[in-house]
Amino acid sequence: MRAALAEAAANETLLAPAQCEGSSECYRRHLLAADASGRYAVVALVWHAGQASPVHGHHAWCGYAILSGTLTETLYRWDESLGLAKPVRTHARAPGAISYTRAGLGGIHRLGNAGPARAISLHVYGVAGDEVSTRVNDVVRVSHR
């Protein structure tokens, strides 16, 4: 997956102009491709300044690469005894950065655009294309102490 995401991230003509359009409401998903057997979907996410995902694990495996702009990723660890996610660290994810994780609570994170300019990321999920908005994120509660 790392090699495929790196190759895609290096392709400056990967996205059509319409696939780079965001939304003022929240980050916007553009389905780029999906396996006919429902094994994976490839999605571009467009993030305007200030937009962020909820804190979440994943119902399916996933990977992503940053295509343009910079996102901030906060990683969390799951505290089974509290039933909450606890923040571990935050780092910037610049163009070309790649990450991937298995399904479950071992890869809890939050992505967001803290910068002033639009950012675009490319995601590959282990779900059918029509399930991207409902079967990917496993939103969790966060410990604030």
Regions found by a protein language model. Name each.
Residues 59-76:
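Glycine- and acidic-residue-biased ligand/ion/polar-headgroup-sensing regions
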Residues 134-138, 142:
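Mixed-charge, glycine-accented linear interaction segment located at domain edges/termini
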Residues 43-57, 103-106:
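Conserved short histidine dyad/triad with adjacent acidic residue
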Residues 63, 78-108:
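Short acidic-glycine-tyrosine-enriched beta hairpin
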Residues 20-49:
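A short glycine-rich, His/Asp/Glu-containing loop-to-beta-strand
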Residues 110-115:
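Asparagine-centered strand-capping/turn motif at beta-strand->loop junctions
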Residues 63-65, 116-131:
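A short hydrophobic beta-strand segment most commonly corresponding to one strand
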Residues 1-15:
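Polybasic, low-complexity association/targeting segments
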